């Protein structure tokens, strides 16, 4: 029996800063304007594809995220495979895999069809894996990736990438070229703020088609605005000028969505939460006195944020304050590259950014923290294959660099050590200290010990919210359901009276909180917010 030929690869997503929207040729997927994007690291976000070719396969099949698709009706995938085989026959005519049917299995470790460039990662990974399978080296694959999904051509290069629209009717000059690699601007970071993991109502393909035929603003954008923005964006990247980079990114995102709204019927991708986050970012930049954070929205509600490394901790702490959620309480609010939250965000600062009227629980699901990365990579470990020896998807495939497996370090910035070792208000704080505290002092009235608190200056388990009228008062509130107590703890008042040492300890803690209150321009109530 002839040997089965297999290849497994991963490929990144890319987030455009100058948007691609609209085609001059739907079959060849030729864009009406140039676009520029940043390729994100596969350490956090990627598509993973395994392709096997075997003489025993009777037909070509594919599976996406564990579900078998209809290959016969997938015109774009068939066009990509046809183009890759044509190229392989020229470059590697003796490759035996060219004679066989294919089994293709692909998974994403991020939400699919939610406006996070899943098709870009998927088709770039398909093309690159086919190149590995057929032995194609040192070829520009971007024109073929483009036929699968336009933005996929940008994911074949790392760093910042420029996709040229080209002028040829056959598309040979519509290619993606690298402006700089991922190491050129090492301080650049990207946050993906996930507000909705569901599939968007209007696909990018449908939206583009409607826009090109109905929007009166569309031609003005592609003729007057985009060419100049591309020139300025290339200059900003070359100079590592974040102010210009950020402003151009946000302006182009705004105009892209304005064109979508000018489409008839309108294509509405952003939600009220999307707009709220955009407004908060403008407030953040105004408060900073310069553009230091930039949003951009693809065709979906989720927010992509470009910012420099030095801004990540403050921005994420601020965002967590505006959008508290279960993921934060469980230590999973930020996934990907770990961060340490800042210890406090002042009430005045929050007011400047919109105040308490902006605070809404569970409107942001989580944040993915990543950076710029390289293009696709081959994985040679057999355990990385998504297909079993029988050519069918594995029941429990190895997920590459899953963001679900990584959580951030809890808040501990002032101490620069893990929270297990910190001293807070003169008291050791952290998971292992909670048991010692309870053993020594008992459980205060109604108190319990939980996970992360609301991030107004809190270590794990405590939310800080100062009460201006009661600046010396400290209250520890319960956030857990009551648990059965032993007989010697049946009456908290009696126990408290019988144990003056515990009362003295809490009085000392209260005094220290009062002192801290005078040093910080926020109101504090030691209370884990119960919502």
Regions flagged by a language model, labelled:
Residues 2-26, 30, 180-426:
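C-terminal nucleotide
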Residues 422-470:
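Composition-driven detector of proline- and glycine-rich
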Residues 16-19, 47-51, 152-155, 159-164, ...:
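Short beta-strand scaffold segments in enzyme catalytic cores
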Residues 1, 91-189, 196:
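Gly/Ser-rich oxyanion-binding loop with an adjacent helix/lid
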Residues 411, 493, 526-531:
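A positional/structural detector of protein chain ends, strongest at the extreme C-terminus
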Residues 260, 271, 473-499:
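Long, low-complexity, serine/threonine-rich intrinsically disordered regions
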């Amino acid at each position: 029996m002839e040997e089965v030929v297999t290849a497994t690869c991963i490929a990144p997503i890319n987030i455009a800063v100058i948007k691609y929207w609209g085609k001059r040729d739907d079959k060849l997927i030729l864009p009406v304007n140039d676009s520029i994007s940043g390729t994100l690291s596969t350490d956090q976000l990627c598509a993973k594809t395994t392709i096997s070719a075997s003489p025993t396969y009777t037909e070509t099949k594919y599976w996406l995220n564990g579900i078998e698709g209809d290959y016969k009706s997938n015109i774009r995938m068939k066009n990509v495979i046809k183009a890759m085989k044509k190229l392989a026959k020229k470059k590697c005519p003796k490759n035996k895999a060219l004679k066989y049917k294919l089994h293709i299995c692909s998974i994403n470790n991020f939400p699919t069809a939610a406006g996070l460039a899943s098709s870009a990662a998927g088709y770039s990974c398909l093309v690159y894996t086919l190149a590995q399978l057929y032995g194609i080296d040192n070829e520009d694959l971007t024109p073929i990736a483009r036929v699968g999904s336009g933005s996929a051509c940008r994911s074949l290069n790392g760093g910042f990438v420029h996709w040229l629209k080209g002028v040829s009717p056959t598309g040979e000059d519509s290619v993606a070229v690298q402006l700089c690699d991922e190491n050129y601007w090492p301080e650049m970071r990207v946050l993906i703020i996930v507000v909705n993991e569901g599939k968007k109502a209007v696909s990018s393909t449908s939206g583009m088609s409607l826009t090109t035929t109905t929007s009166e603003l569309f031609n003005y954008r592609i003729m007057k605005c985009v060419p100049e923005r591309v020139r300025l964006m290339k200059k900003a990247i070359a100079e590592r000028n974040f102010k210009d980079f950020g402003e151009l990114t946000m302006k182009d995102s705004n105009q892209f969505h304005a064109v979508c709204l000018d489409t008839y019927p309108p294509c509405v991708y952003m939600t009220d939460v999307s707009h709220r986050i955009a407004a908060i970012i403008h407030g953040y930049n105004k408060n900073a006195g310069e553009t230091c954070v930039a949003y951009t929205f693809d065709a979906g509600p989720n927010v992509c944020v470009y910012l420099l490394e030095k801004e990540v901790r403050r921005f994420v702490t601020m965002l967590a304050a505006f959008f508290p959620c279960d993921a934060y309480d469980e230590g999973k609010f930020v996934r990907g590259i770990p961060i340490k939250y800042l210890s406090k965000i002042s009430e005045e600062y929050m007011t400047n950014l919109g105040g308490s009227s902006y605070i809404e629980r569970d409107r942001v699901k989580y944040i993915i923290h990543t950076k710029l990365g390289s293009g696709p990579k081959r994985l040679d470990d057999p355990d990385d294959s998504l297909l079993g020896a029988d050519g069918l998807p594995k029941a429990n495939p190895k997920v590459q660099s899953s963001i679900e497996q990584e959580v951030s370090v809890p808040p501990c910035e002032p101490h620069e050590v893990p929270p297990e070792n910190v001293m807070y208000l003169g008291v050791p704080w952290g998971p292992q200290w909670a048991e010692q505290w309870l053993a020594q002092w008992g459980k205060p009235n109604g108190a319990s010990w939980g996970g992360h608190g609301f991030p107004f200056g809190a270590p794990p388990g405590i939310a800080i919210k100062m009460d201006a009228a009661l600046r010396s008062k400290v209250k520890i509130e319960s956030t857990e359901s009551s648990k059965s107590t032993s007989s010697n703890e049946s009456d908290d008042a009696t126990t408290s009276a019988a144990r003056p040492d515990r009362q003295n300890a809490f009085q000392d803690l209260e005094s220290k909180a009062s002192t801290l209150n005078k040093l910080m321009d926020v109101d504090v109530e030691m209370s884990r917010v119960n919502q």
